Amino acid sequence: ARPPGFSPFRIV
């Protein structure tokens, strides 16, 4: 349920 490249610790 998260877009590719999504990280809860790094949002770019």
Curated annotation (Swiss-Prot):
Question: Which GO terms are recorded in the biological process aspect for this UniProt protein?
Answer: regulation of blood pressure; vasodilation
Q: Where in the cell is it found?
A: Secreted
Q: Which GO terms describe its molecular function?
A: toxin activity
- Residue intervals passing through the bilayer: none
**Tissue expression profile of the protein:** Expressed by the venom gland.
User: What GO CC terms are in its UniProt record?
Assistant: extracellular region
Q: Which UniProt keywords apply?
A: Bradykinin receptor impairing toxin, G-protein coupled receptor impairing toxin, Hypotensive agent, Secreted, Toxin, Vasoactive, Vasodilator
Q: Which domain of life is it from?
A: Eukaryota
| Protein family | Belongs to the bradykinin-related peptide family.
Q: Function of this protein?
A: Bradykinins are a potent but short-lived agent of arteriolar dilation and increased capillary permeability. May target bradykinin receptors (BDKRB). May cause hypotension.
The protein here is known as Vespakinin-X
UniProt source species: Vespa xanthoptera (Japanese yellow hornet)
